Design a protein with these regions (language model features):
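Hydrophobic beta-strand scaffold residues
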Residues: 38, 125, 170-171, 281
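Redox-cofactor binding/interface segments in oxidoreductases and associated redox assembly factors
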Residues: 9, 98-99, 211
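Short glycine-enriched loops at secondary-structure junctions
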Residues: 129-133, 237-240, 287-290
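Phosphate-binding site of ATP-dependent enzymes
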Residues: 23-24, 158, 165-169, 179-266, ...
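ATP-dependent carboxylate activation and anion-phosphoryl transfer catalytic cores
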Residues: 2-5, 10-12, 16-20, 244, ...
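Short glycine-rich anion-binding loops that position phosphate/pyrophosphate groups of nucleotides
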Residues: 13, 101-104, 175-177, 299
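Conserved N-proximal alpha/beta basic substrate-recognition cap immediately N-terminal to
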Residues: 3-4, 15-153
Length: 329
């Protein structure tokens, strides 16, 4: 039996989660059932303290602290968690940190990954912060061009117009968004592309991702969960009527979805790279025969897969975490 672990959960406010769908909640319940101790904090309460660090062998070490609470969780609507008193703890004293806050993948997010690196390798961070920083979901996928639909990432309006002229029906996405926010389908006869681009670039200095629209999305956008590079389950997310986006955040309907031969081919192609980078918990998105995104920040879908297939992937995730912590401890 694995020893009891001290587990810090870096996430958004726990009082706002949907306990019937939140994957972080499923991970916390599973950790608690194994006898691990949970501690909750938000990114905004982290502090990297220079000059107050302990001295070991004459070498000054920066220490990463956070203000947070010990927490117990229970599957009970309206009262799903119980906090201990607010306290400050040294995150370097934790066995595991689950990095589970949602994007946007902005400079605040990137800064948090840099701060977390100060407690490695003594603390296992899931997913590895440097790997997450180097693998934004909509960019990591471009390292597998043979698996993805025609795609353009650019600031150049003329390049976007040329891409549309070639492929006619396109999807326009903010590069660092999540949950389907800001995603538009521009049909061949749509006259709003110029206005959309003007609005985006007036507000943001970030490039856009443009992809060929895949009609197969009407049959669903499949989310496949990989644990340490191995596919363990999937759900299909079907767009609502009149909606181009299939994300569950915007009304996509989850349904059972077995893994196909093409799904397994995609997973076999990307799995070793994910494992080598320390990306233990990953969710990929597949439309038809194409890989469209690789989600490494805070993947979701665990509870939906459990409901449809009876497969509790959170157990496999904790099996792998415990295996990886053992040599550290």
């Amino acid at each position: 039996m694995a020893r009891s672990l001290q587990v810090a959960v870096q996430m958004d406010p726990i009082d706002s989660i949907n306990i019937d769908g939140d994957s972080t909640f499923a991970l916390m319940l599973e950790a608690q059932s194994r006898g691990h101790t949970l501690w909750h904090y938000e990114v905004r309460h982290m502090a990297l303290k220079e000059g107050v660090s302990r001295v070991t062998g004459g070498k000054r070490e920066e220490r990463l602290f956070a203000r947070g609470h010990s927490v117990k969780v229970v599957r009970r609507h309206g009262a799903h968690f119980e906090f201990g008193p607010m306290e400050t703890r040294d995150l370097g004293g934790m066995d595991v940190v689950l990095m589970r806050q949602d994007p946007p993948f902005d400079m605040a997010y990137i800064t948090a990954t840099h701060m977390l690196e100060h407690i490695q390798p003594g603390t296992l961070i899931v997913n590895d912060p440097a790997a997450v920083r180097n693998a934004p979901e909509k960019i990591l996928v471009t390292h597998f061009p043979d698996l993805m639909p025609p795609t353009l990432i650019t600031w150049d309006v003329e390049a976007i117009r040329a891409f549309r002229a070639e492929y006619k029906d396109i999807i326009v996405k903010p590069l660092y968004g999540n949950g389907g926010a800001g995603v538009f389908r521009i049909k061949p006869d749509d006259e709003n592309l110029a206005s959309l681009l003007e609005m985006h670039f007036a507000r943001s200095r970030e490039p856009l991702m443009i992809q060929r629209y895949e009609a197969a999305v009407r049959q669903g956008d499949k989310r496949i969960i990989l644990v340490d590079g191995e596919p363990l389950g999937a759900i299909n997310r079907v767009p609502a009527a009149g909606e181009a986006r299939s994300n569950m955040h915007v009304g996509g309907r989850p349904e059972r979805s077995p893994l196909t031969a093409r799904d397994l081919e995609i997973c076999a192609a990307i799995g070793p790279a994910l494992r080598d980078q320390g990306l233990i918990f990953v969710g990929i998105d597949v439309i038809g025969d194409y890989l469209t995104e690789i989600n490494v920040t805070s993947p979701t879908g665990l509870q939906e897969i459990a409901r449809f297939d009876g497969v509790h992937i959170e157990k496999a995730i904790w099996d792998r975490i415990e295996e990886k912590v053992a040599p550290i401890g």
